[in-house]
C-alpha cells in the first residue's frame, strides 16, 4: 500500500472514532478493506443506517476502490443506485485520498437519491458534488486531545500546521481539557487530521517521540455561509467553563458547545 493510503486509513480511524464507526476488516499484501458505519436522517425523520465497505487495492489511490453498500432501510435498487453514484464520484478524484469525502457526500445527498423529487419541490437545492463540498464550503471540526507531555513543542507544531494549511480557529486549554477548534476548507481540515494522526508530535512516558494516539473528533460540520468565522488561529487558556463557553458563543458556535463540550465537565 502507498504511504498516502496508510495515512488515510489512520485518519479515518481518528475521524470515525466512535465504537463501531470505522473498522479495518482485512489487511494483506493485496490491499486493505475498510468499513465505515454511518447514519443519515431520512425525510420521514427515521434514521437510515449505512455500512459502506471500501476495498482498497495495493495501487490505491491510483486505482479506484471497490465499493459496496449495505442497509436494512434501503431497497436493493436504492443500494445499487447509491453505489453507482459513489463510483461516479470516485472517478472524479482518482489519485487522491477520497474515502472520507465519499462518506460525507453520501450523508449530504442520500435523501435526494432516494426520493428524486422534482426540482420545484427541492426549491433549487440539488445534490452537492464533491467539488462543492470540498472547495466552496467552510468546515468546522472540534478535536479533543487527552494530554500534551511536550506542550511547548506540541503547540508550535499545531501552529505551524494550521499556518501551512491556512486554517483558523483556537487551541484551547482549560485545566486538563485540551480542545482544537479548526475552520477551513474540506481538504485542509482533512490534511490536518492526517498530520495529527500520523506525525510524531509528542513524547511518551519514557520521553521517546510518539504519534498522537488519544485524539477524538467531537464534531465535524459545515459552517453556514452567513455565519461569521475565525480569521486567525490562536492559542488560548481559560480560567473557567464560563470563559470557554463565551468563546464559543462569540463565534456563533453555542450549539457545538452545548452538544459536544458541556458534557465533558
Curated annotation (Swiss-Prot):
| Entry annotated with the keyword DNA damage | no
- Gene3D superfamilies tied to this protein: Ubiquitin Conjugating Enzyme
Where is the protein situated, by its record's location annotation?
Answer: Nucleus; Cytoplasm
Which InterPro entries has this protein been placed in?
RWD_dom (IPR006575), RWDD3 (IPR038840), UBQ-conjugating_enzyme/RWD (IPR016135)
Does the record's keyword annotation contain Ribonucleoprotein?
Answer: no
Specify one Pfam family.
Answer: RWD
* GO BP, sorted A to Z: positive regulation of hypoxia-inducible factor-1alpha signaling pathway; positive regulation of protein sumoylation
What main location does UniProt list? nucleus
GO CC annotations on file = cytoplasm; nucleus
Any coiled-coil regions, as ranges = none
What is the official name of this protein in its record?
RWD domain-containing protein 3
Organism of origin is Xenopus tropicalis (Western clawed frog)
Q: What is the lineage of its organism?
A: Eukaryota, Metazoa, Chordata, Craniata, Vertebrata
What gene does this protein come from? rwdd3
Amino acid at each position: 500500500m502507498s504511504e498516502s493510503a496508510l495515512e488515510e486509513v489512520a485518519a479515518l480511524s481518528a475521524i470515525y472514532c466512535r465504537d463501531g464507526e470505522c473498522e479495518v476488516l482485512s489487511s494483506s499484501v493485496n490491499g486493505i478493506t475498510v468499513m465505515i458505519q454511518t447514519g443519515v436522517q431520512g425525510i420521514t425523520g427515521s434514521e437510515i443506517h449505512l455500512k459502506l465497505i471500501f476495498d482498497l487495492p495495493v495501487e490505491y489511490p491510483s486505482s479506484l476502490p471497490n465499493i459496496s453498500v449495505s442497509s436494512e432501510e434501503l431497497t436493493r435498487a436504492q443500494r445499487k443506485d447509491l453505489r453507482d453514484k459513489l463510483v461516479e464520484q470516485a472517478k472524479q478524484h482518482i489519485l487522491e485520498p477520497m474515502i472520507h469525502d465519499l462518506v460525507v457526500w453520501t450523508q449530504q445527498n442520500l435523501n435526494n437519491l432516494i426520493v428524486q423529487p422534482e426540482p420545484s419541490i427541492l426549491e433549487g437545492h440539488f445534490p452537492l458534488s464533491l467539488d462543492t463540498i470540498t472547495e466552496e464550503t467552510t468546515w468546522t471540526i472540534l478535536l479533543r486531545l487527552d494530554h500534551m507531555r511536550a506542550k511547548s513543542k506540541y503547540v508550535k507544531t499545531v501552529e505551524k500546521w494550521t499556518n501551512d494549511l491556512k486554517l483558523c480557529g483556537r487551541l484551547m486549554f482549560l485545566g486538563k481539557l485540551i480542545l482544537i477548534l479548526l475552520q477551513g476548507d474540506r481538504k485542509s481540515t482533512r490534511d490536518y487530521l492526517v498530520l495529527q494522526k500520523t506525525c510524531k508530535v509528542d513524547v511518551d512516558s519514557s520521553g521517546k517521540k510518539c504519534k498522537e494516539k488519544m485524539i477524538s473528533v467531537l464534531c465535524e460540520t459545515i459552517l453556514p455561509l452567513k455565519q461569521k468565522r475565525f480569521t486567525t488561529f490562536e492559542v488560548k487558556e481559560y480560567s473557567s467553563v464560563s470563559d470557554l463557553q463565551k468563546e464559543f458563543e462569540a463565534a456563533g458556535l453555542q450549539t457545538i458547545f452545548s452538544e459536544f463540550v458541556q458534557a465533558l465537565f
